[in-house]
Regions:
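Short gly/ser/thr-rich secondary-structure transition/capping motifs
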Residues: 1-5
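Glycine-rich phosphate/diphosphate-binding loop of Rossmann-like nucleotide-binding domains
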Residues: 8-53
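Short, ordered loop/turn segments at secondary-structure junctions
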Residues: 24-25, 54, 79-81, 115-121
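Short, well-ordered secondary-structure micro-motifs
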Residues: 31-33, 61-65, 86-90, 123-126
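Active-site rim loops that border cofactor/substrate pockets in soluble metabolic enzymes
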Residues: 43-70
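Short beta-strand segments at enzyme active-site cores
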Residues: 51, 73-78, 110-117
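Glycine-rich phosphate-binding loop
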Residues: 63-100, 104
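C-terminal binding/interaction regions
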Residues: 94-128
Length: 128
């Protein structure tokens, strides 16, 4: 998927309780993702969001669920998983994606999907 054609939205998020759940792996990349999410929220009028740090992508769904249970109106999930030499990449990416989808559907609360699943660190840097 390319960033070309991304929608230009005018959103008022000033009254929303927003939780950003972000992984702790590859902070050189996730810090950039987090900064971008913070800029977008501030542009939408929200400066009272909460940041929830988790170890890795596998923990994103549970953190999203807990954030919703704590009152979040919307969750933004951020992280990066970089392909290695084992199938671990596939398991983590699938589990995180399916888990976030399940939480979103079970709770009826939107979850912005900002989990980069890439082949190389450079791809992640280019997308962050």
């Amino acid at each position: 998927m390319s960033g070309a054609g991304a929608p230009k939205l005018n959103i008022d998020a000033s009254d929303l309780q927003v939780a950003i759940v972000v992984t702790s792996w590859h902070t050189n990349i996730t810090d950039g993702l987090l900064a971008g999410a913070e800029r977008a929220l501030k542009a939408a009028g929200n400066e009272t969001y909460e940041i929830w740090r988790v170890p890795g992508a596998f923990e994103l769904p549970l953190a999203a669920q807990k954030a919703i249970e704590a009152g979040a109106d919307v969750v933004v999930a951020l992280g990066v998983v970089i392909q290695g030499d084992t199938p671990h990449f596939d398991y983590v990416c699938s589990s995180a994606t399916e888990g976030l989808t399940r939480v979103q559907l079970d709770y009826g609360v939107p979850i912005g999907f900002g989990l980069l699943t890439v082949n190389t660190e450079q791809q992640a840097l280019d997308r962050a």
